[in-house]
Swiss-Prot record:
It catalyses: RNA(n) + a ribonucleoside 5'-triphosphate = RNA(n+1) + diphosphate. GO terms for cellular component: chloroplast; DNA-directed RNA polymerase complex; mitochondrion. GO terms for biological process: DNA-templated transcription. Its main location: plastid. Transmembrane segments: none annotated. It comes from Populus trichocarpa (Western balsam poplar). In plastids the minimal PEP RNA polymerase catalytic core is composed of four subunits: alpha, beta, beta', and beta''. When a (nuclear-encoded) sigma factor is associated with the core the holoenzyme is formed, which can initiate transcription. The keyword Kinase does not apply. This is DNA-directed RNA polymerase subunit beta. PROSITE patterns: RNA_POL_BETA. PANTHER family: DNA-DIRECTED RNA POLYMERASE I SUBUNIT 2 (PTHR20856). Pfam families: RNA_pol_Rpb2_2, RNA_pol_Rpb2_3, RNA_pol_Rpb2_6, RNA_pol_Rpb2_7.
Length: 1070
């Protein structure tokens, strides 16, 4: 609960609420809507009819728990049962049975689904809302061309445009356009009806030529003309029923189905009163749209802003799941129809249960969760990442935009985003502005609109009422800006306040204000709301910080931030990472893996998460925070999870930082750190890596898991048990065998070694023909084996192979090359780890932990880090924690600076250290060089900011290649760490080597180490024998490739060798 002096208390909604509401809407309404659309299915002779009785459908509780579904790589789903019946029309007999339709993946308490043991989340998509939109564009002559675009529910478009002669055309594709009269006639109207239903009949008559009259003389002629233009068919097509069906399928069903939202928008924009259940485009819509277009041409009416959120709709998890359910039912309908026909053909008596199979529904949802762009693997790097992932909004995906084609205008911040989509939190790179994040209080309305809350200010009533407004409603109100939140009641009448009205910012009297913002975080997403003093930062750096907080690694010893924003507790609780008491009671037992709680006549065992791997290889682990015998209340934290302390988010550490240059080691965002951070495990984190292997049944027989692997050294097999699987608790190094596996193979007589053939001939011993295919620990994987899982799928066929997974725990201290960052976009790479005695130290002798470059502050304009740094120092000395809401200048000018300086002054006074606050240079202090003991020339800013260690770690990225694979075409080393690739020496690198004059190294780079096949083969032999490496004589493979490409363009490339003696030309082919 956070409150404001004038607005009373307001509760922040649950951060997973959007996902929960969407899934509940799908279960309660979406399932029934799609089941009602399922048709009655008859056989060809119309003797048997099959139908579903939708009134009684039920979902069964899952037979497995969430944790077991993850462990065994299963789907956490519920079985759907519907009553169905077969009716024999001749005898009027009916057979009714309960039918199993299929499995529907359920949503868990985190707002995610578990599919094949993987946490997946469906993100919200922003689409253009169906309806009609008018806009004006300048043509190549500089004349305004007015168009009206009708967008269907499926994304299809029909454009109406008016030319300089006031003729109206309907454009059904980019190249083809037809007269509005032809389109109206093809939709069923004659000329008299057209003229009676328009406001400007004289304009329609003005472009009615004799040729046009012939085209619309009958509906058949109009349909033929429309078909010819739409399909670009030459000649004279003949009118037929099949032609009408093709036009109906290709044009009217795809481009003319408006849907419920489109019909509402169409009625509202064109002032129509067509019933809402009539969801297809009608001739009346076309004529009304043409009338509005003519009015636009003559200066009447307003153009539409396509990027305004009132013209967008949110396609939530409910809509996506409902679409997939409808698709599955269409597939099921085809299956049932085929099964009925087959049963009658073979003279079998079908039953409802025999007709229906669960395959269509199950496979549809599996492919949706596995392949759909909006269904993503849940990012579980830390608790914040889990929460933010479900609140993303994307313009990308089916029916949406692409990163290559989206314009700057779409990516830009729009005034209607205020309080709905965060103006800061978006992705970096090609998708900037296309993937955003919903604000804290935003919610999705009934028709897919994004709603934001406001307080209603009423002169009559003293009660404050909260309203949720959609984007098309709030622009009609005078809304007071957020900086007038703290005005006291007495002074309000005399105040002139800034307000927002119709996307403009005005200054008005308080009496004119109808609504006001009610929460400091209302405009920001969760990630941006966790940045203290965000108002003092440049927005670009705040964007980086929002993204980098999601990359923070949970540390072994987490610590709460001294300076926060007050949102840390709710983020941690809603993420589901800490264990929370659901009932009040008494703790009767605690252990490392469970807590037992006793209440009024019941006993509950609460299992704890033990060293669970996230999909980013971070360690999820819960630690008990309650003691045996204690009484607890409902909602109390029982156990902290990864990156939480006391139920609050704790992503990093409060460490002592100085902003100063140090021997060039913090040049260009490099960071200098003390060895204390390594030896005291300040930034030590645990990572769990997963390695798996499968056993198949091959044509030569089944693969075997065994510890008897021939031709391998004994020390590589030292950790295997008698079954050939690595033992729990073993310490494994690179190259060790984790799972011993032999694959049978067919051996020919010629493939046997001579000694094998001798053994067979003399002793009759059958030599093993198995190939060693063991699971070996790759480079950089050393650690402790903490878990081995043997997953056996049901059936045990070769299509369902057995899987063995090995989980290895790694302990990683901070090292040179790791990435660290603050909460203000101030990021850097560790450049050197200094002994603590060499680090600069304060006047009380405390050595600094980290040294940042001071030049990184003024140019980046992220001054918030300086406020946090100084306030953190005061908090550590006073043993206080601060929770500062953003934009505190609304209370008084320079509020942030006054708070920081007053706390620093108090800290210096209470601790007896006057250097903490020196009036000549507040926030700065004189510090000393640890190597010499001499003071530095200038005072330095010191403090305790909150610094995070990010997932970008040098252990995952450092790579070296001695030998490896080559590309087939260019014969050059492959690219990338995963392929054991090499570092490319490109054009600029060649220039650099030329600049140093290292000709031999350059020749090696371009020949032996790259694509000179013969030369690199000779290098190994000459190196072993000690001979001189021969110089490459002919051209490398890349040059040969160039010649071949030129030959493919009919350009023959040859070079000539001219003799010095007689200048006789000897031709030599390349």
């Amino acid at each position: 609960m956070l409150g404001d002096g004038n607005g009373g208390m307001s509760t922040i909604p649950g951060f997973n609420q959007i996902q929960f509401e969407g899934f509940c809407r799908f279960i309660d309404q979406g399932l029934a809507e799609e089941l009602y659309k399922f048709p009655k299915i008859e056989d060809r002779d119309q003797e048997i009819e099959f139908q579903l009785f939708v009134e009684t459908y039920q979902l069964v509780e899952p037979s497995i728990k969430e944790r077991d579904a993850v462990y065994e790589s299963l789907t956490y789903s519920s079985e759907l049962y519907v009553s169905g019946g077969l009716i024999w029309k001749n005898s009027r007999d009916m057979q009714e049975q309960t039918i199993f339709i299929g499995n529907i993946p359920l949503m868990n308490s985190l707002g995610t689904s578990i599919v094949n043991g993987i946490y997946r989340i469906v993100i919200n998509q922003i689409l253009q809302s169906p309806g009609i939109y008018y806009r004006s564009e300048l043509n190549h002559n500089g004349i305004s061309v007015y168009t009206g675009t009708i967008i269907s529910d499926w994304g299809g478009r029909v454009e109406l445009e008016i030319d300089k002669k006031a003729r109206i055309w309907a454009r059904v594709s980019r190249k083809q356009k037809i007269s509005i009269l032809v389109l109206s006639s093809a939709m069923g109207l004659n000329l008299r009806e057209i003229l009676e239903n328009v406001c400007y009949p004289e304009i329609f008559l003005s472009f009615l030529s004799d040729k046009e009259k012939k085209k619309i003389g009958s509906r058949e002629n109009a349909i033929l003309e429309f078909y010819q233009q739409f399909t670009c068919v030459g000649g004279g097509p003949v009118f037929s029923e099949s032609l009408c069906k093709e036009l109906q399928k290709k044009f009217f069903q795809q481009r003319c189905e408006l849907g419920r939202i489109g019909r509402l928008n169409m009625n509202q924009r064109l002032n129509l009163d067509i019933p809402h259940n009539n969801t297809f485009l009608l001739p009346r819509d076309i004529l009304a749209a043409a009338d509005h277009l003519i009015g636009m041409k003559f200066g009447m009416g307003t153009l539409d802003d396509m990027n305004h959120l009132k013209n967008k709709r949110i396609r939530s998890v409910a809509d996506l799941l409902q679409d997939q359910f409808g698709l599955a039912l269409i597939r099921l309908e085809n299956v049932v129809r085929g099964t009925i026909c087959g049963a009658i053909r073979h003279k079998l008596i079908p039953t409802p249960q025999n007709l229906v199979t669960s395959t269509p529904l199950t496979t549809t949802y599996e492919s949706f969760f596995g392949l759909h762009p909006l269904s993503q693997v849940l990012d579980r790097t830390n608790p914040l990442t889990q929460i933010v992932h479900g609140r993303k909004s994307s313009y990308l995906g089916p029916g949406g935009l692409t990163g290559r084609t989206a314009s700057f205008r779409i990516r830009d911040i729009h005034p209607s985003h205020y309080g709905r989509i965060c103006p800061i939190d978006t992705s970096e790179g090609i998708n900037v502005g296309l993937i955003g994040s919903l604000t804290i209080h935003a919610k999705i309305g009934h028709l897919g609109s994004l709603e934001s809350p406001f307080y209603e200010i009423s002169a009559r009533s003293k009660k404050v009422r909260m309203l949720y407004l959609s984007p098309n409603r709030d622009e009609y109100y005078m809304i007071a800006a957020g900086n007038c939140l703290a005005l006291n009641r007495g002074a309000r009448e005399e105040q002139v306040v800034p307000a927002r009205y119709r996307q403009e910012f005005l200054t008005i009297a308080w009496e004119q204000v109808r609504l006001r913002s009610f929460f400091p975080f209302q405009y920001f997403s969760i990630g941006a709301s966790l940045i203290p003093f965000i108002e003092h930062n440049d927005a670009n750096r705040a964007l980086m910080s929002s993204n980098m907080q999601r990359q923070a690694v949970p540390l072994a010893r987490s610590e709460k931030c001294i300076v926060g924003t007050g949102l840390e507790r709710q983020v941690a609780l809603d993420s589901g990472v800490p264990a929370i008491a659901e009932h009040e009671g008494k703790i009767i037992y605690t252990d490392i893996d469970k807590i037992i709680l006793s209440g009024n006549g019941y006993t509950v065992s609460i299992p704890l998460v033990m060293y669970q791997r996230s999909n980013k290889n971070t360690c999820m682990h819960q630690k008990t925070q309650v003691q045996r015998g204690k009484c607890i209340k409902r909602g109390q934290v029982l156990a902290d999870g990864a990156a939480t302390v006391g139920g609050e988010l704790a992503l990093g550490k409060n460490i002592l930082v100085a902003y100063m240059p140090w021997e060039g080691y913090n040049f260009e965002d490099a960071v200098l750190i003390s060895e204390r951070l390594v030896y005291e495990d300040v930034y030590t984190s645990f990572h769990i890596r997963k390695y798996e292997i499968q056993t198949h049944v091959t044509s030569q027989g089944p693969e075997r898991i065994t510890n008897e692997i021939p031709h391998l050294e004994a020390h590589l097999l030292r950790n295997l048990d008698k079954n050939g699987i690595v033992m729990l608790g073993s310490w494994v190094e690179t190259g060790d065998i984790l799972i011993g596996k032999l694959t049978p193979q067919l051996a020919k007589e010629s493939s046997y070694a001579p000694e094998d053939r001798l053994l067979r001939a003399i002793l009759g011993i059958q030599v093993s023909t198995s190939k060693e295919t063991c699971l070996k620990l790759p480079t950089g994987g050393r650690g402790r084996v903490i878990d081995v899982r043997w997953i056996q799928k049901k059936g045990g066929s070769s299509y369902n192979p057995e899987t063995i997974r090995v989980y290895i725990l790694q302990k990683r201290e901070i090292k040179v090359g790791d990435k660290v960052a603050g909460r203000h976009g101030n990021k850097g790479i560790i450049s050197k780890i200094l002994p603590r005695q060499d680090m600069p130290y304060l006047q009380d002798g405390a050595p600094v932990d980290m040294v940042f470059n001071p030049l990184g502050v003024p140019s980046r304009m992220n001054v918030g880090q300086i406020f946090e740094c100084s306030l953190g120092l005061a908090g550590s000395l006073l043993d206080r924690h601060y929770r500062v809401a953003p934009f505190d200048e609304r209370y008084e000018q320079e509020a942030s600076r006054k708070l920081v300086f007053s706390e620093l002054y108090e800290a210096g006074k209470q601790t007896g250290n006057p250097w903490v606050f020196e009036p000549e240079c507040p926030g700065k202090s004189r510090i000393f060089d640890g190597r010499t003991g001499d003071p530095f020339e200038q005072p330095v800013i010191i403090g305790k900011p909150y610094i995070l260690k990010l997932i970008h770690q040098v252990a995952d990225k450092i790579h070296g290649r001695s030998s490896g694979h080559y590309a087939l075409v260019t014969q050059q080393p492959l690219r990338g760490r995963a392929k054991q690739g090499g570092q490319r020496v490109g054009e600029m690198e060649v220039w650099a080597l030329e600049g140093f004059g290292v000709s031999h190294i350059l020749q090696e780079m371009l020949t032996y180490k790259s694509d000179h096949i013969r030369a690199r083969q000779e290098v190994l032999g000459t190196t072993i024998s000690g001979r001189t490496i021969p110089k490459p004589e002919d051209a490398p493979e890349s040059f040969r490739l160039l010649v071949r490409e030129l030959r493919s363009l009919a350009l023959e490339l040859k070079h000539f060798l001219i003799s010095e003696k007689n200048f006789q030309i000897n031709r030599k082919e390349v």
